[in-house]
Structure formats: structure tokens, C-alpha cells
Swiss-Prot record:
Gene Ontology BP, a term: tRNA processing
Originating species: Stanleya pinnata
UniProt-recorded name of the protein: Maturase K
Main subcellular localisation: plastid
Function as written in the Swiss-Prot or TrEMBL entry: Usually encoded in the trnK tRNA gene intron. Probably assists in splicing its own and other chloroplast group II introns.
Chain segments annotated as coiled-coil in the UniProt record: none
Length: 502
């Protein structure tokens, strides 16, 4: 590892000029497969931990791959050999290269990040990594906004777009040519065998997607910091990406000399941008006309600069007071709570009507039921059915599975403003569990519950149910408060599986 660190300690002017030779070093493959990059990237992606890649690794295969890379013609898959062992062998080599490329290309970014935070006392909070941490921010900010632009980020349809995007950040021409060569060769094989699943390393694919999105955000966020409203005029000159960083450094000079008739910008502090799960939202207090201009800007940004056919239907304008916003598995909208205050001055009394605006987050019950039906927990109408494929397991295993699913759902949707839909989902899972156990023992549901008692269903009580029941006393008013309590957890790092149904 010390040899690896010494090889990578280069100055800023040449920090991206020595990536290609790393493909021919055996110790890099060892580091890539035994997760030796912990010091460079402490927050290692979970996609690197793939058991299939580790099982196929050997030093002999690495040596053969390095010899083949010295002669790139041996890595080309001839058309007549696509269905033979040679094609499968080369495809496995591309799999190894994808693992290595994801690690090597991240090296300059990791070193740059480490040098930027070195000597700075930064407080790290793992709570900010939670998905639920964004909802308190939305509750505080979105209550003052009128419209939200919901954008589905498109994927590039041509491989050269990915290569060109990476070219602005990796200056090593040899690495880029080698990356282009391997990517095209892999796609040739993929087109031939369309039934074969992708064997490219998930971390490599994630890096390509993040590079693609980062390029888009580098332009959009640059405009966001200095603007809010874009006039409906041409701004194609701004898409000269090679001179982009020079324009950032000389922003005032550029806009005074070249852009007064091309791009009009106005300051607006009430503009928030959030990206999540392949989508992004833009919230603002703009009028419908200005929101349509933002929509026009997004469409032209993707079509003119990224050469991606971007339909206007991918950008939805939602009015928070009327429309529901689908966000991380929740349906969010603004709710008006009327409040009446009584004020008395001397002998006269006054009634003052106030309206409190609050962001309301609800559970998309129809989407969740559709996901449960897809996984055979209920039918499309939401009626529970037995899980036939689980009847071969033990009773404790079946019960633990249902309890774990129920608690995960309750944990994720604990921030819902109304718990009625959450209770319905719990009911479906409880009855599905009972029907599965009754089917296993060849009994009816009523007879099975009568034999075991109600203690079976107590296992489905979640941790928050038990804690909140201790906080609030047992009364009708307390039960209503418990029904409205919203809990955001700071340990949820992944979307619930049922959220990904759509």
C-alpha cells in the first residue's frame, strides 16, 4: 500500500496523467479485490463488496489479462468467435477491467477530497446520510413555496456521451482511449447476447452515472447560484463546455461583454434543488409562467448540450396546494390548517382567522398494495392471501420474516401524517402471516388463532408503537395524538423495497 501511495503522490498539475500505467500493475488488482482502498475512501461503496468478483480473482488470471492488454487486438472479440469460449473469456476480462477502472478513476477524486479537508476540523454526522433527514428540511422550506418542478433525469443513449463527460475530469488520454475501447467491445458482445445480464461492476456503472449527473449539475448549479429566472432567449453559446471553468472565473466580464442579449439572470434566494433516486426537484415561489421557462430550460439543456432526446413530459410542474408530489416513497402536499384566535380589547372582542400552511406527507397506499400484490402478499384489491412459497419453512422462520417486513415498513413510513394507511398495510401482513401458517398446518385461520391465541400478533408491535404508548397516557385524546405523531429516523440509508415498485 505504501508503494501504491507513493506512486500516486503527484503534484496538482499532473495528478491525472498517470492513471493508465496502473492498469498494468498487479498490486492494483489485489487492492481492488481485497478492498485495500479503505484509506483513500473510508466511506467505501457497498457495491464493491461483490462475492462473485472475489471468487473469480486469481493472480494467474491477472497476469494473463495484463499480457492481453499490452496487445489490445487480442481483446477484440471477432464476430465469428462470439459464441465460442474466446468471447466468454474476453468478456470476463472486461468484467475485471470494469472493477479496476472504477477504483482507479476514483483515485484522483479521493486524493483531491482528502487534501481539501486536511487540516480542517469538520464535524462528521452520520445522521445527515439518512433518507429521513431531508424531510424536516422540506417541512421547513416547502411550506413557503408554491410550485415544484419534478424532473426525471435522462440517461445518455450514446456511449460517446459518457466518454466525453469523463474527458473533462480525467486528463489522461490513454486511459480514456482504453476506456472507450473496452466499453464499445463490451457493448458489441452485449448486443449479440441480449439475454445475458450485465456483468459490469455495479460500482463502475454507478460511477458513470454520477459523472453524467455531475456534469449536468455543474452547469445547472452554477446558474442556480447566480440566477433564478431565465428569459426565453437563446443561450447556446454558454454550452461551450471547454471554456466553462474560464467563464466561472471571469463571470462578470463574460456577462458584461458577451451575454447581455443572450442570457438574462435575476437573483432569487427562494430556490431549492434536491436530487434523489434518478430524479430531481426544483422548488420555488415563482409564477406559472416562470416555471414553464425553467421547464423549457431543462429540456433544451439536455437536448442541446447532452444530445439526449428529452421529452417535455419528463418535467412536471406541480402546484403544492393542489397536486401531490411523489418523493422518496411519500406523497407530499401542502395542507391548510385554519386557526381562529380570539382577541379582546377593553369591551370589544375580535376573532382573527389565521391559516397555517404545513407540508403533509402521506403513504401512497395504492402503490404499496400493488407492490405487495406483486410479491404475492395480497391480491390487487388488497385482500391478504397466503404466501405459498414460504410454507416449507419453520414456523419461527415464517413469523420472523413477516415481522421483519412489517417493522421495516413501519420504520420507513413512521413520518406519515396519517397512520391509517400504515395500519392497513400492517393488517395485510399480519393476516397474510396467519393464513400462511394456517395453510402450512392444514387448518383454518379461525381454528389456528384459537389454538395459539392473540399472543402471536403481539410480535408485530414495532419499537415506535411500544415507546410512544409509554410516552402518552392511555386516553382517547392521547390516542388521537399518537395517531398524528410523526417520527423521522436518522438511521435509514436505503429506500424500502416496496418503494421501488413503480
Amino acid at each position: 500500500m505504501e508503494k501504491f501511495q507513493g506512486y500516486l503522490e503527484f503534484d496538482g498539475a499532473r495528478q491525472q496523467s498517470f492513471l493508465y500505467p496502473l492498469f498494468f500493475r498487479e498490486y492494483i488488482y489485489v487492492l481492488a479485490y481485497d478492498h485495500g482502498l479503505n484509506r483513500l475512501n473510508r466511506n467505501r461503496s457497498i457495491f464493491l463488496e461483490n462475492a462473485d468478483y472475489d471468487k473469480k480473482y486469481s493472480s494467474l488470471i491477472v497476469k494473463r489479462l495484463i499480457l492481453r492488454m499490452y496487445e489490445q487486438n487480442r481483446l477484440i472479440i471477432p464476430t465469428k468467435d462470439l459464441n465460442k469460449n474466446l468471447g466468454h473469456t474476453n468478456l470476463f476480462y472486461y468484467q475485471m477491467i470494469s472493477v479496476l477502472f472504477a477504483v482507479i478513476v476514483e483515485i484522483p477524486f479521493s486524493l483531491r477530497l482528502g487534501s481539501s479537508v486536511e487540516g480542517k476540523k469538520l464535524k462528521k454526522s452520520s445522521n445527515l446520510q439518512s433518507i429521513h433527514s431531508i424531510f424536516p428540511f422540506l417541512e421547513d422550506k416547502f411550506s413557503h413555496f408554491n410550485y415544484v418542478l419534478d424532473v426525471l433525469i435522462p440517461y445518455p443513449i450514446h456511449l460517446e456521451i459518457l466518454v466525453q463527460t469523463l474527458r473533462y475530469r480525467v486528463k489522461d488520454a490513454s486511459s480514456l482511449h482504453f476506456f472507450r475501447f473496452c466499453l464499445y467491445e463490451y457493448c458489441n458482445w452485449k448486443n449479440f447476447d441480449s439475454k445475458k445480464k450485465s456483468i459490469l461492476n455495479p460500482r463502475f456503472l454507478l460511477f458513470l452515472y454520477n459523472s453524467h449527473v455531475c456534469e449536468y449539475e455543474s452547469i445547472f448549479l452554477f446558474l442556480r447560484k447566480r440566477s433564478s429566472h431565465l428569459r426565453s432567449t437563446s443561450y447556446e453559446v454558454f454550452f461551450e463546455r471547454i471554456l466553462f471553468y474560464g467563464k466561472i472565473q471571469h463571470f462578470l466580464k463574460v456577462f458584461i461583454n458577451n451575454f447581455p442579449s443572450i442570457l438574462g439572470l435575476f437573483k432569487d434566494p427562494f430556490l431549492h434543488y434536491v436530487r434523489y433516486h434518478g430524479k430531481c426537484i426544483l422548488a420555488t415561489k415563482d409564477t406559472p409562467l416562470l416555471m414553464n421557462k425553467w421547464k423549457y430550460y431543462f429540456v433544451n439543456l439536455w437536448q442541446c448540450y447532452f444530445f439526449v432526446w428529452f421529452k417535455s413530459q419528463r418535467v412536471n410542474i406541480n402546484q403544492l396546494s393542489k397536486d401531490n408530489l411523489k418523493f422518496l416513497g411519500y406523497l407530499s402536499s401542502l395542507r391548510l390548517n385554519p386557526l381562529v384566535d380570539r382577541s379582546q380589547m377593553l369591551e370589544n372582542s375580535f376573532l382573527i382567522d389565521n391559516v397555517r400552511i404545513k407540508l403533509d406527507s402521506k403513504i401512497p397506499i395504492y402503490s404499496i398494495i400493488g407492490s405487495l400484490a406483486k410479491n404475492k402478499f395480497c391480491n390487487v384489491l388488497g385482500h391478504p392471501i397466503s404466501k405459498a412459497t414460504w410454507t416449507d419453512s419453520s414456523d419461527s422462520d415464517i413469523l420472523n420474516r413477516f415481522v421483519r417486513i412489517c417493522r421495516n415498513i413501519s420504520h420507513y413510513y413512521s413520518g406519515s401524517s396519517k397512520k391509517k394507511n400504515l395500519y392497513r398495510i400492517k393488517y395485510i401482513l399480519r393476516l397474510c402471516c396467519v393464513k400462511t401458517l394456517a395453510r402450512k398446518h392444514k387448518s383454518t385461520v379461525r381454528a389456528f388463532l384459537k389454538r395459539l391465541g392473540s399472543g402471536l400478533l403481539e410480535e408485530f408491535l414495532t419499537g415506535e408503537d411500544q415507546v410512544l404508548s409509554l410516552i402518552f397516557p392511555r386516553s382517547d385524546y392521547a390516542s388521537k395524538r399518537l395517531y398524528r405523531v410523526r417520527v423521522w429516523y436518522l438511521d435509514i440509508l436505503y429506500l424500502n423495497d416496496l418503494v421501488n415498485h413503480e
